[in-house]
Amino acid sequence: MAELTIRPEEIRDALDNFVQSYQPDAASREEVGTVSVAGDGIAKVEGLPSAMANELLKFEDGTLGLALNLEEREIGAIVLGEFSGIEEGQPVQRTGEVLSVGVGEGYLGRVVDPLGNPIDGLGEIATESRRALELQAPGVMVRKSVHEPMQTGYKAVDAMVPIGRGQRQLIIGDRQTGKTALAVDTIINQRDNWRSGDVNKQVRCIYVAIGQKGSTIASVRGALEEAGALEYTTIVAAPASDPAGFKYLAPYTGSAIGQHWMYDGKHVLIIFDDLSKQADAYRAVSLLLRRPPGREAYPGDVFYLHSRLLERCAKLSDEMGAGSMTGLPIVETKANDVSAFIPTNVISITDGQCFLESDLFNAGQRPALNVGISVSRVGGSAQHKAMKQVSGRLRVDLAQFRELEAFAAFGSDLDAASKASLERGKRMVELLKQPQYAPFPMEEQVVSVWAGTTGKMDDVPVEDIRRFEAELLEFLRRERKDLLTSIAEGGKMSDDTLQSVADAIAAFKQQFETSDGKLLGEG
């Protein structure tokens, strides 16, 4: 029988190998905290010394919380969901994760909550990956100047305050002045681009509803579906009934979904409706977490709340795929006061604003755009060349009309030139009126604006202007389709093109009958 011998060196080597290759069990150690205060959508948690800012926490019933305040003895967290089941003394676990949302093409045509969960009853969403809500905005070196137009379909906006892809254009005004209608019509106006199948033309749209009535969100969804625009739109809904934490997070969820497409080389339009309610929700959360209040009781970082959100909208350089995300934030004012805290903050962050005025709205001017204080700082370089060519005089003419109108109200005698300017101004104001859910293609806008600014409608009675425009465009679509196509596909209009437009208008006038039964051609 062979002698069995074990040398000490072999034992030592075996122990060394075992120690080096030892893998401990996964659940070796975890931190568990305790809820000390709960209520009103927030929770104070003791006993999680290693928790990080914006880390997700998990409560006993599976509800998630977001760590916002990291204090010496406790953590202040907002509860993401129903907080009635969270009580003092319950255990809380760290997850080691930050808040993220699923992204991908599966979100098109769907309605989701601020955590990315579907709430439209159409089943689960197939996601491609997950994206953190708090991601750095694109840096200066990966951006490109705005140079492509983003058509809204509104003559007043596309002619005087043009918007480019990658721009942030604020829509501001009192309640019930048509802010949401302008945003929804801009989404609907992207329909033909989407159906063209051209990736460079297609725009994916995201509508973020913050603190809106549930019925309002449902009506927006219905309008988009009826217009055939829901197929390329995602709705992120945080209605008024949702906790303040959801209303605070909803815009970041929408921008995370949009950023995924932007970095993929696609074009995105995102609407935040509206950021006043997000600021109110953030103020409520901050006051509940005992953060020191500042002006109008908003916390000190409320500017950063909006700046870090809106800076994510950008036009990326060709090296980054040339994608873009255009932002249309909406802010509600009180009594047309644009000098309040939140409006001035957002005005200073954005690249321009469309100011909608309740007096104009009530006077029947829709969209109720106040041209005097509405401005687009970067959109001019993105405006279609034909539109730029015909709309140059429009803003000046309207400003002169407003001055003359105020002057004429005193009953003073006006010279012939002033009277002519006043009459043309009345027709231009009438021409810029537009019904909801009826956006105009760019080439038809160009024809309408050119006809108005060059005096081709001066002999049309004011009450017939809109009917004249509608029938003229129908005549052009039927008889001179080639002319509209050449305007749409070309750049600046040549003298020959302008002459062709003038001839077409003259030919149409021969058959247009005014409301008093008179043919314009006879005049």
Swiss-Prot record:
E.C. number(s) listed in UniProt: 7.1.2.2
A single Gene Ontology CC term: plasma membrane
Membrane topology designation: Peripheral membrane protein
One Pfam family hit: ATP-synt_ab_C
CDD domains noted in UniProt: ATP-synt_F1_alpha_C, ATP-synt_F1_alpha_N, F1-ATPase_alpha_CD
GO molecular function: ADP binding; ATP binding; proton-transporting ATP synthase activity, rotational mechanism
Gene3D superfamilies assigned to the protein according to its UniProt record, in alphabetical order: 2.40.30.20, ATP synthase alpha/beta chain, C-terminal domain, P-loop containing nucleotide triphosphate hydrolases
Highest taxon listed in the record's lineage: Bacteria
The UniProt record lists the keyword Magnesium: no
Keywords in alphabetical order: ATP synthesis, ATP-binding, Cell membrane, CF(1), Hydrogen ion transport, Ion transport, Membrane, Nucleotide-binding, Translocase, Transport
UniProt-annotated site: Required for activity, residues: S374
Subcellular location: Cell membrane
Catalytic reaction annotation: ATP + H2O + 4 H(+)(in) = ADP + phosphate + 5 H(+)(out)
Positions contributing to ATP binding: G173, D174, R175, Q176, T177, G178, K179, T180
UniProt xrefs under InterPro entries: ATP_synth_asu-like_sf (IPR023366), ATP_synth_asu_C (IPR000793), ATP_synth_asu_C_sf (IPR038376), ATP_synth_F1_a_nt-bd_dom (IPR033732), ATP_synth_F1_asu (IPR005294), ATPase_a/bsu_AS (IPR020003), ATPase_F1/V1/A1_a/bsu_N (IPR004100), ATPase_F1/V1/A1_a/bsu_N_sf (IPR036121)
PROSITE patterns found in the cross-reference section: ATPASE_ALPHA_BETA
Subunit details: F-type ATPases have 2 components, CF(1) - the catalytic core - and CF(0) - the membrane proton channel. CF(1) has five subunits: alpha(3), beta(3), gamma(1), delta(1), epsilon(1). CF(0) has three main subunits: a(1), b(2) and c(9-12). The alpha and beta chains form an alternating ring which encloses part of the gamma chain. CF(1) is attached to CF(0) by a central stalk formed by the gamma and epsilon chains, while a peripheral stalk is formed by the delta and b chains.
Function comment: Produces ATP from ADP in the presence of a proton gradient across the membrane. The alpha chain is a regulatory subunit.
Listed PANTHER family: ATP SYNTHASE SUBUNIT ALPHA, MITOCHONDRIAL
Assigned protein family: Belongs to the ATPase alpha/beta chains family.
Name of this protein: ATP synthase subunit alpha
Organism: Streptomyces griseus subsp. griseus (strain JCM 4626 / CBS 651.72 / NBRC 13350 / KCC S-0626 / ISP 5235)
